[in-house]
A protein has these predicted regions:
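Long, low-complexity segments enriched in small/aliphatic residues
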Residues: 377, 381-449
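Extracytoplasmic/lumenal domain signature
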Residues: 59-73, 98-118, 130, 144-177, ...
């Protein structure tokens, strides 16, 4: 896949959030603020990011003061979302260490050092009903681990000597799976930790089955096959035995739980490969689906597929949001999902019936040999929140005339529009693009008012399919399989499909002639 992006100045609507941890100076108010727990990623199992507080208002927000400071990052980026229970804040800091901090003073309570490979977006907190057992559930590389929340020590009775290997039980030899770590902390329901995964979205990636583990023992309690096995619902939407070789179709983002009903909602990603599906002809359930499961058993209750046979990497990346709506004089407990391609789909939480009509509309076929783009796609009748076609009038007016002309010619030669399949004959310009729309962390809700909030961006991206040279053309037959796996999993994203190089990553085609082995190794 050849991928290009418009220059940064042509990005149409990108919002960047920068957060500062602050505590209100007590002398600003009449009394000490009431402690509010933030014990789940997203604030609650519902991922609403909502809490009731009246102390910070438009009138006094300018009086916020930094109460304490704790350095969290040695270098680079940190996407970690802290959680707060009672007066303790848990945060990733100091070279991939997990730290407990007193939330009122900033004083360090304990540190569990050097957790290289710790999920960089968050952790889970669980406690027994008597509160005698309090633990943090974390993922480190391909494992799940448990840490005592009060002492910071590893709980060795969890799993196998303190570890649960997430590579096991995935229709593949575990040792052949390089990457299975979840990018997100998962979600808790009662004594179950429900986990998604990020196995990668290239060939040789593992399938992204969703699994639930006992938080005390680490025992696997249930598995939902996102690529169905024989006899399971949706198996016929794939070629025979697709679960043995197709990967992805994973939940890499935020899952949501309706704790009262015991339902977990899964926003499932696209199958491998993101932009080419000739080896996975069919609608490809449960790729790109919002799926409702019985949280205790993993049994499917209902599903809705937002993109059939995805060729655009329009996986579901935002958290499903739980809302109570008034519709035609009737209260409806609903779940809403906002998509990368700019639509909002709303369903009855229990039945899966659409609250607002959804239409199946026709779209262009693919011109690629063997590819079978799905003839229709579901379109919500609610207003979309992004544009879908790049036109010449969108080019940055401050570009030089020469630069404008270059882009005018490129737009004329390309195809742009919603659900235009990628091709190897011309460029396809996607808008809002695979990085746009409602992406990871981009939705929130006010459950009481029935309000859904979406942070959206438009990220026009240029794609063109390239034929990838077979390793058989370059290597001896005995090393082909191993070499393809190594390059795909470790090198391809930066150095290109055919080792041609991308951006600052150099080409590797003639590396053997240009670089001595010892230099290359180092």
């Amino acid at each position: 896949m050849k991928s290009g992006k418009f220059p940064a100045k042509t990005i149409l609507a990108v919002l960047i959030l920068v957060g500062l941890v602050t505590i209100l100076s007590y002398n600003t108010f009449d009394k000490k603020p009431k402690s509010i727990n933030w014990s789940h990623y997203g604030g609650s199992p519902g991922q609403s990011r909502y809490f009731e507080a009246s102390q910070i208002t438009k009138k006094n927000v300018n009086k916020l003061q930094v109460a304490w400071y704790y350095p969290t990052v040695d270098s680079g980026f940190n996407y970690f979302s802290p959680i707060v229970v009672d007066t303790i804040m848990y945060v990733m800091a100091k070279n991939s260490s997990l730290v407990a901090i007193h939330a009122e003073t900033g004083k360090e309570i304990w540190i569990h050092a050097n957790l290289q490979g710790l999920t960089r977006r968050g952790i889970n907190y669980w406690e027994s009903k008597d509160r005698k057992d309090r633990r943090l559930l974390i993922t480190v590389n391909n494992t799940i681990q448990a840490i005592d929340a009060l002492t910071g020590k590893s709980i060795m009775s969890f799993g196998n000597n303190g570890y649960v290997d997430m590579r096991e039980g995935l229709d593949r030899e575990p040792t052949s799976i390089r990457r299975m770590q979840s990018m997100m902390p998962g979600v808790l329901y009662d004594n179950l930790l429900i986990m998604g995964s990020a196995p990668g979205e290239n060939y040789f990636s593992a399938p992204g089955h969703v699994r639930a583990y006992n938080v005390v023992t680490g025992k696997l309690e249930w598995t939902f096959h996102t690529i169905p096995h024989p006899g399971e619902y949706g198996y016929e939407t794939w070629p025979k035995d697709a679960y043995k070789y197709v990967g992805g179709t994973n939940v890499w983002s935020e899952m949501t739980v309706d704790t009262e009903r015991g339902i977990v909602y899964l926003p499932i990603g696209s199958p491998t490969n993101d932009f080419y599906g000739a080896d996975r002809i069919g609608a490809n359930l449960f790729g790109n689906c919002l799926v409702a499961l019985n949280a205790r058993t993993g049994k499917r209750l209902w599903h809705f597929q937002t993109v059939h046979h995805d060729l655009w990497d329009y996986d579901l990346a935002s958290a499903p949001q739980l809302l109570t709506l008034n519709r035609n004089g009737k209260k409806i407990d609903a779940v809403a999902i906002a998509t990368k391609h700019g639509f909002v789909f709303v369903f009855d939480r229990v039945t899966g019936e659409p609250v607002f009509p959804i239409e199946e509309r026709p779209f262009p076929p693919s011109e690629m040999p063997g590819e079978q783009a799905w003839p229709t796609q579901p379109i919500s009748t609610l207003p979309d929140f992004t544009r879908h076609e790049v036109t010449k009038d969108m080019i940055n007016p401050y570009y030089s005339q020469e630069e404008k002309e270059k882009w005018y010619k490129r737009i004329d030669a390309a195809k742009s529009g919603l659900f235009v399949p990628p091709s190897d004959k011309y460029e396809t310009i996607m808008l809002p693009g695979a990085l746009g729309g409602a992406n990871f962390g981009n939705t929130a809700a006010d459950p009481k008012k029935g309000m859904l909030y979406i942070l959206t961006q438009e990220y026009p991206s240029v794609y063109k399919l390239n034929r990838i040279k077979s390793a058989k053309e370059l290597m001896s037959a005995g090393d082909v399989e191993l070499a393809e796996k190594i390059y795909t999993n470790n090198c391809r994203a930066c150095h290109g499909d055919n080792m041609e190089g991308r951006g600052i990553a150099p080409g590797l085609v003639d590396a053997g002639q240009r670089i001595l082995f010892d230099d290359f190794k180092n």
